[in-house]
């Protein structure tokens, strides 16, 4: 091994020694990558989950907005009625998997020792709803022979002032308001948004501990991360933390660039999450739904090519291909092929995320979604021809919606086959 490389990587290994994992050093999008060490010994399972096994996944995302009360009625009964409706409507459209938000804002849809109760449940973050929503949602989903994946935003705490008020026990307030100044940068601000800072081993451990809570205590079929990694490619966002890393190095060490350092931080989080899940229950799947453009993903420190080719990161990838065949920047067919080519590990499933919310609307992609009423149908057919393992639709609220009714009707002709 090259001596310069050793000098470069050893300090980073020391920096993140709290969490063992796979570290990928990648200065450019397509440069050769070096791995140390990867979870090659982790047992991989061939079955999918609750009822799908090796069949086609037909999933729908259930975002926090779909779970939230529309009339400020925060009773246990009203929540259960909303979720019952979600399950019943999904069954009508041949959905066999629900991807349900359980941690949208550094919060929790169950009683957690780490994260406060979600504001979705009572209107106020931190308030106990008096029942276990996650337990109910899983039991209801399984009773209809559907799979349940717990959807987690790993870093997001607040987005555009949602939720409006963070609980005192929210990690942001806890770390910013205590007497310990050394943890102030464990959370970061960007405009009206707040995020956990994944460069610190302590922060990554807390995120992973939150996943452990779910997998240990609930019979989920999967854990699902979406595309929220580093929220910006602006290097000022975490410059002070990067400077801390630089100051920790010996004079002879060759530092990682800030881009390389960010990628290593995220890879440590992802591989650590995967390892933790498998150590508890090897049948629970771990998947990520990155944005469509791989180059943009890499700018946000998502090391797609490593995740898609090596053991120890994910069980599935579901790129959010919310684009149609006429998209002038990246067409659907081109994106499908790019991802098909990227996912070279036969142990990793390839699902395609479809932007159902765009169907029948003239608001997106220069109005090209109004050019036909069978775009989703053709996307399913093209995806199947490419060898994908299933589809995830965004989002549930557009399954039974006047805007998308014709598209859904045509898509069902092929999804039911």
List each language-model region with its residue ranges.
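Sec-dependent signal peptide cleavage junction
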Residues: 19-38
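Active-site-adjacent "subsite" loops/lids of carbohydrate-active enzymes
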Residues: 50-81, 150, 155-217
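The substrate-binding groove and active-site-proximal loops of carbohydrate-active enzymes
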Residues: 65-77, 115-131, 190-205, 254-265, ...
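Short, acidic/polar
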Residues: 72-91, 203-214, 296-312, 332, ...
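Catalytic domains of carbohydrate-active enzymes, especially glycoside hydrolases
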Residues: 81-108, 217-222, 312-316, 383-390
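Aromatic-lined substrate-binding rim segments of carbohydrate-active enzymes
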Residues: 86-87, 103-153, 254-280
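Polysaccharide-binding and catalytic clefts of secreted carbohydrate-active enzymes
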Residues: 177-310, 322-323
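Substrate-binding cleft of secreted/luminal carbohydrate-active enzymes
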Residues: 311-331, 338-417
């Amino acid at each position: 091994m090259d001596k310069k490389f050793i000098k470069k990587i050893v300090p980073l290994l020391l920096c993140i020694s709290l969490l063992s994992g796979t570290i990928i050093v990648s200065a450019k999008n397509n440069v050769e990558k070096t791995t140390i060490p990867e979870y090659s010994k982790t047992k991989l399972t061939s079955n999918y989950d609750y009822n799908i096994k090796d069949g086609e996944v037909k999933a729908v995302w259930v975002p926090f907005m779909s779970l939230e009360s529309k009339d400020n009625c925060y009773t246990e009964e009203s929540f259960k009625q909303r979720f019952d409706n979600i399950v019943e409507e999904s069954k009508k459209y041949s959905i066999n998997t629900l991807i349900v938000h359980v941690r949208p804002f550094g919060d929790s849809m169950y009683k957690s020792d780490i994260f406060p109760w979600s504001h979705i449940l009572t209107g106020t973050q931190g308030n106990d709803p008096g029942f276990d929503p996650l337990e109910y949602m899983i039991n209801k989903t399984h009773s209809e022979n559907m799979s349940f994946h717990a959807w987690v935003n790993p870093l997001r705490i607040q987005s555009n002032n949602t939720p409006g008020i963070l609980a005192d026990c929210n990690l942001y307030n806890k770390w910013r308001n205590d007497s310990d100044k050394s943890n102030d940068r464990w959370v970061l601000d960007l405009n009206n948004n707040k995020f956990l800072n994944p460069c610190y081993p302590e922060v990554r451990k807390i995120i992973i501990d939150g996943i452990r809570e779910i997998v240990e205590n609930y019979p989920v079929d999967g854990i699902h991360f979406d595309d929220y990694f580093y929220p910006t490619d602006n290097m000022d966002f975490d410059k002070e933390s990067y400077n801390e890393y630089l100051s920790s190095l010996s004079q002879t060490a060759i530092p990682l660039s800030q881009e390389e350092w960010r990628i290593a931080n995220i890879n440590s989080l992802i591989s650590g999450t995967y390892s933790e899940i498998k150590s508890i229950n090897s049948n629970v799947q771990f998947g990520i739904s990155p944005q469509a453009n791989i180059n943009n993903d890499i700018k946000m420190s998502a090391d797609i090519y490593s995740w898609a080719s090596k053991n120890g990161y994910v069980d599935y990838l579901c790129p959010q291909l919310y684009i149609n065949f006429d998209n002038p920047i990246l067409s659907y067919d081109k994106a499908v092929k790019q991802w098909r080519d990227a996912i070279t590990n036969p142990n990793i499933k390839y699902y395609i995320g479809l932007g159902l919310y765009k169907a029948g609307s003239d608001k997106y992609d220069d109005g090209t979604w109004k050019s036909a009423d069978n775009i989703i149908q053709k996307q399913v057919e093209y995806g199947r021809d490419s060898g994908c393992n299933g589809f995830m639709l965004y989002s549930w609220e557009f399954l039974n919606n006047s805007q998308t009714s014709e598209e859904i009707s045509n898509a069902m002709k092929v999804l039911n086959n």
